Each structure stands twice: as structure tokens, then as C-alpha cells.
């Protein structure tokens, strides 16, 4: 896969398919290009659009973190610095952003800052911190320390330990309890599709209701039964159908 220098770091990226608009996939807090599996290709095929996937700094085969870092503004940094530079260098003017979990929050921050987008498709987005989500992240830390989770993450990330702590340490920082991006939602004026699993261990429908109440564009909510934190894996048919319908309506 090719690499691109963004904000002083070499980031791995991949193109799939062709056609407009361009779909930009923003992975979750422990995600990567490979962890999307074949889902982006399915969306690209169903819509006739090209898809861009990339690994954020510290993820996948992109540059390893130079040193462990914890910042509660890591999603702001991505949305306001790295993502605009990446899209400019790849000459992507008005994308459709498809974000999962932290990636969905990054999409909202990017659009809320006034950057041009055609629409936002959000899976399991976070706009504020819920106590049940913190408990789940604490549980994942225990799993990382006591199970083979580091080895499993190592299949996808050059330095799984630093990747894990980039995400986990930030979310468990006491300051992160006050993290909230609801103030940016009023500046989101494009169509939004927000998808949430009933059994998501990191967030509830309260996240989606907050988005719908605050954004200025149209906002469709999709609540899926039998679905956890990864709707595209737990309910792939329903999610693919909803995404394809949403994206075709934007054309």
C-alpha cells in the first residue's frame, strides 16, 4: 500500500473502486485498514463510489508513535489537523465521511469545524462520555493485561502496545470524563446517518439522540437489535443497505 506524509508522519492508505463522491473511512480507536475487512469494498461496489481508507498515526503500518502520549484532544487533533491535510494532499474536495466509534466522532468534529463534506455516516459515534462506556474500557484494559489481546492486535499494528495505550489511556484519563463535542454539532449542516447497536457496550442511543437534536441538517437514526459496538460486522446486511441508500441520495 502507498504512504503519504501527513503532519510529519508517514501514513498508510488504500484506494478502492472509482467514481464520485469519494467515501473516506475513519476507523475506530483500535482499528486499522485491515480491520475494516471487505466492508469498504462492499460499500464502494454498492454505490459506484471510490473509497479511501487510511491508518491514523500510530495505527496499522503507519508510523509508530515516537513516544507514548496521552491527550484528551486526540480526536480533535485528527479532525482539525491531520485529516484536512490528508484530504488536501489527495485532492479530495467534498467527501462523504464514514466513521466508526472514535472515527465517527472525528467525522463530526471535521464537519463541525466547517470543512466541506457531502454527508456523514456514523456508526457507534461518541459525543459525550457515558459511565457504562468507561467501565467497558476499563474491562478491555484488564483483558489487555491478562489475555492474548496484545498478540491479536499485533496482527494489525506495528506496535500494538503503544496503539492500545494511545486509545485506552486517553479514555481513562480523569480529564476525559468531561470530554464533550456536542457544541460542534450545531455547525453540522449536511445530511447525517447515525447507526447504533442496542447491545453496544461503549455507548447508548442517547449519543444518537443528542446528534439528532443538535445538527442542522437532516438526521436519520438507525437502531439495530442483536448488534454491539461494530454494526458493520454484527449486522452487515442492514448496515450496507442503509449506507448505500444514504449515499445514493447524496449524489
What are these regions (language model features)?
Residues 9-65:
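Conserved HGGG/HGGXW glycine-rich cap/lid loop of the alpha/beta-hydrolase fold
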Residues 47, 53-94:
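Active-site loop/oxyanion-hole signature of alpha/beta-hydrolase fold enzymes
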Residues 105-148:
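Flexible "cap/lid" loop of the alpha/beta hydrolase fold
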Residues 167-184:
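Active-site nucleophile elbow and catalytic-triad environment of alpha/beta-hydrolase enzymes
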Residues 188, 194-196:
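Short beta-strand/loop motif that positions the catalytic acidic residue
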Residues 190, 204-213:
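Short alpha-helix in the alpha/beta-hydrolase fold that links the catalytic acid
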Residues 198-203:
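Acidic catalytic loop of the alpha/beta-hydrolase fold
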Residues 220, 225-251:
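Catalytic active-site module of serine/aspartate enzymes centered on a nucleophile-bearing elbow/loop
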Amino acid at each position: 500500500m502507498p504512504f503519504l506524509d501527513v503532519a510529519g508522519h508517514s501514513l498508510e492508505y488504500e484506494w478502492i473502486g472509482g467514481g464520485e463522491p469519494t467515501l473516506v473511512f475513519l476507523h475506530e480507536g483500535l482499528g486499522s485498514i485491515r480491520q475494516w475487512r471487505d466492508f469498504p469494498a462492499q460499500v464502494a461496489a454498492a454505490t459506484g463510489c471510490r473509497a479511501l481508507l487510511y491508518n491514523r498515526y500510530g495505527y496499522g503500518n503507519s508510523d509508530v508513535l515516537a513516544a507514548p502520549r496521552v491527550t484528551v484532544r486526540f480526536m480533535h487533533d485528527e479532525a482539525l489537523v491531520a485529516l484536512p491535510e490528508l484530504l488536501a494532499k489527495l485532492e479530495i474536495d467534498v467527501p462523504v465521511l464514514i466513521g466508526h466509534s472514535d472515527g465517527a466522532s472525528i467525522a463530526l468534529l471535521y464537519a463541525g469545524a466547517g470543512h466541506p463534506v457531502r454527508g456523514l455516516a456514523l456508526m457507534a459515534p461518541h459525543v459525550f462520555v457515558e459511565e457504562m462506556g468507561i467501565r467497558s474500557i476499563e474491562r478491555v484494559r484488564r483483558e489487555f493485561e491478562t489475555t492474548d489481546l496484545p498478540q491479536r492486535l499485533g496482527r494489525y499494528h506495528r506496535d500494538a502496545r503503544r496503539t492500545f495505550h494511545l486509545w485506552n489511556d486517553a479514555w481513562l484519563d480523569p480529564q476525559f470524563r468531561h470530554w464533550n463535542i456536542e457544541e460542534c454539532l450545531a455547525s453540522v449542516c449536511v445530511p447525517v446517518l447515525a447507526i447504533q447497536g442496542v447491545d453496544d457496550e461503549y455507548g447508548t442511543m442517547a449519543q444518537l439522540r443528542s446528534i439528532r437534536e443538535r445538527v442542522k441538517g437532516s438526521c436519520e437514526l438507525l437502531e439495530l437489535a442483536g448488534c454491539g459496538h461494530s454494526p458493520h460486522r454484527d449486522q452487515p446486511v442492514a448496515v450496507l443497505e442503509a449506507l448505500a441508500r444514504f449515499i445514493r441520495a447524496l449524489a
